[in-house]
Amino acid sequence: MGQDSNWQIDDRVDDVFNNVVIPVFESLINDYDQVDGYEVKIVSDGPLILGIEKYSSIRIKHPGGLEMIICVYWVKNSERLIAENILLITHNKSFDIFSVTKEELASQVKFLSGLKT
């Protein structure tokens, strides 16, 4: 990849986090936090993976006490955004950073965290 391509990817990643990831997390907090015993908040936890350049995480605590932490992250120089339940590492989903939508990401975060849909 050339330097221009890396710059374009970096800009796109910033755009995705600002306009897709954070709004999805804020929407989940508004829709679920303190509703029917759920606790939902943004946390600083992240996966232990080399090369992660940017990430955001949300914790969903279910009424019975079960906690799920969903991390959305980007590995430097890739064109993939990953949503992963970092407490159940085998559960993840990747998205193309140039086509990911709020709806796709919200649906996957709900699925990975076990939230009602």
Predicted regions and their residues:
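Solvent-exposed, charged interface segments at domain starts and junctions
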Residues: 1-7, 62-67
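Negatively charged, low-complexity tracts enriched in Asp/Glu with abundant Ser/Thr
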Residues: 2-55
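Lipid-handling modules and contact-site tethers
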Residues: 4, 8-12, 16, 92, ...
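Intrinsically disordered, low-complexity regulatory segments enriched in Ser/Thr/Pro
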Residues: 55-107
